[in-house]
Amino acid sequence: MLQIKNLSKSFPNPYGEPNTIFENLSIDIEDGEFVSIIGSNGTGKSTLLNIISGLIKESSGQITLDSTTITNLAEYKRTQIVSRVFQDPSLGTCPSMTVRENLSLALNKGKLLNLKKCLRHKTNNLEHLLEGISLDLKKYLDIKVQYLSGGQRQSLSLIMSSLASPKVLLLDEHTAALDPKTSNEVIELTDKIVREKNITTLMVTHNLKHALQYGDRLIMLHKGEVVLDVKDKEKENLTVEEILEKFEYAV
């Protein structure tokens, strides 16, 4: 279980009072749970992911994973248990390397190998990883990532992020920069990977349809607080219009 306990975060403000994002925020997320997080800009969604990943430090509070505190664990050490896919398709991959080389690097993540050994992997094994991917990545194993489309790069980032079997996967608006068709293909791939590998997943999104259609649970943040938290039948019966009404009420 991923537990966020009494989390607070403030940023210094040279012109006055500190900018408080969270104050005593607490959320428990079950193992394998796929949680969509929505809310207006500036409400703390990406900040929450940044704190969980170790990119920024919380002001106070605690984060535990499977009853082990990771609050003081360095970011580079958290990468062994926490993977992340960003909104920008150019992040999360090495653009000057081929698809094959990127996958090989991800497969050897955390191993004490030199680069030459890291990049060795059998073609059959790599092709198997790309089976059923609608964006034709299998055909581009020996193409440099910089020549792929945004959707292909984001799909590759997703696959790479899951290869080391992380305990937690953080998705930061990972379909926002894609066209509608490609966005739907990437979210379908996301759901497939999360379900098959049973990864505890937090997905920040502005796409309310995706937030309702995918995932086990929906959380809405507003001014650093949870103003909506639904799952199961309650989530299934929720509509986009009802979410918008709740958002307007929170504002």
UniProtKB/Swiss-Prot annotation:
Q: Name one GO molecular function term.
A: ATP binding
Q: Name one GO biological process term.
A: amino acid transport
One GO CC term on file:
plasma membrane
Ranges that cross the membrane:
none
Per the annotation, which location comes first and is thus the protein's main one?
A: membrane
ABC transporter domain ranges (all copies): 2-248
UniProt topology in membrane: Peripheral membrane protein
Indicate yes or no for the key word ATP-binding. Answer: yes
**Pfam families membership:** ABC_tran
Phenotype caused by lack of the gene: C.difficile isolates lacking CDR20291_0805 and CDR20291_0806 show reduced uptake of tyrosine. Production of the tyrosine catabolic end product p-cresol is decreased by sixfold, and the intermediate fermentation product (4-hydroxyphenyl)acetate is not detectable at all.
Query: Which top EC class is named for this enzyme in its record?
Result: translocase
User: Cross-referenced PROSITE patterns, in alphabetical order?
Assistant: ABC_TRANSPORTER_2
Write out the entry's keywords from A to Z: Amino-acid transport, ATP-binding, Cell membrane, Membrane, Nucleotide-binding, Translocase, Transport
Q: Where is it localised?
A: Cell membrane
- Recorded superkingdom: Bacteria
| The EC number(s) this enzyme carries | 7.4.2.13
Q: Which reaction does it catalyse?
A: L-tyrosine(out) + ATP + H2O = L-tyrosine(in) + ADP + phosphate + H(+)
Annotated positions binding ATP: 39-46
State the oligomer form and interacting partners: The complex is probably composed of two ATP-binding proteins (CDR20291_0806), two transmembrane proteins (CDR20291_0807) and a solute-binding protein (CDR20291_0805).
The text of the family note is:
Belongs to the ABC transporter superfamily.
Q: What does this protein do?
A: Probably part of an ABC transporter complex involved in tyrosine uptake. May also import phenylalanine. Probably responsible for energy coupling to the transport system.
The protein depicted here goes by the name Tyrosine transport ATP-binding protein
Q: Which organism is it from?
A: Clostridioides difficile (strain R20291) (Peptoclostridium difficile)
Classification from the root reads: Bacteria, Bacillati, Bacillota, Clostridia, Peptostreptococcales
